[in-house]
């Protein structure tokens, strides 16, 4: 037991809590990498994009890994915006507005996109139309992805940002040392509060993102049957 633990008997418990929260944060980060790569694969395959897959930087900091995901998502948003603009140019205004109408049936939207998708992509597939309907101008890009980008940016600039993602494998003391070194001996309570605050936001945003991209993948499978 460290000497300070005699003065602060709750410190061992706090160390364990930091360890647990750190692992949860890494799990969320890992999931975001996987889901982003799944989305990248769908866009490359069905919308003709040439987006690069991303990989978690095991020797990097939490901020560096957040930035990798943010950069990938920003590129995805730009690609979807290009397709959205192309749809707007090719479709009659009334038809384009139907794509934005949440009350409009998805099958009707796919039929609308199917009319012009070959002009935009050079080929027309129902899978491409389904992906476009699910992602272009939808709440996925305007809300869910933007929210996750915002959450990741906040995590990156927080006191957690400078902590390495690999410190977990080095033991609890290394995590604590990394935290204390990063924030000049800020108490463990502050670290725990920061983890809890950001994890609450991250888990919520990540879950919505995961669900949305799973829906896109499911829609593609339906069209390929």
Curated annotation (Swiss-Prot):
Entries under InterPro entries matching the protein: DUF4533, SMCO3
Transmembrane regions listed in the UniProt entry: 155-175
Keywords: Coiled coil, Membrane, Transmembrane, Transmembrane helix
Domain of life: Eukaryota
Entry's localization field: Membrane
Membrane among keywords: yes
GO cellular component, one term: membrane
Membrane topology listed for this record: Single-pass membrane protein
Any coiled-coil regions, as ranges: 69-92, 182-209
Pfam families in alphabetical order: DUF4533 (PF15047)
Annotated protein name in UniProt: Single-pass membrane and coiled-coil domain-containing protein 3
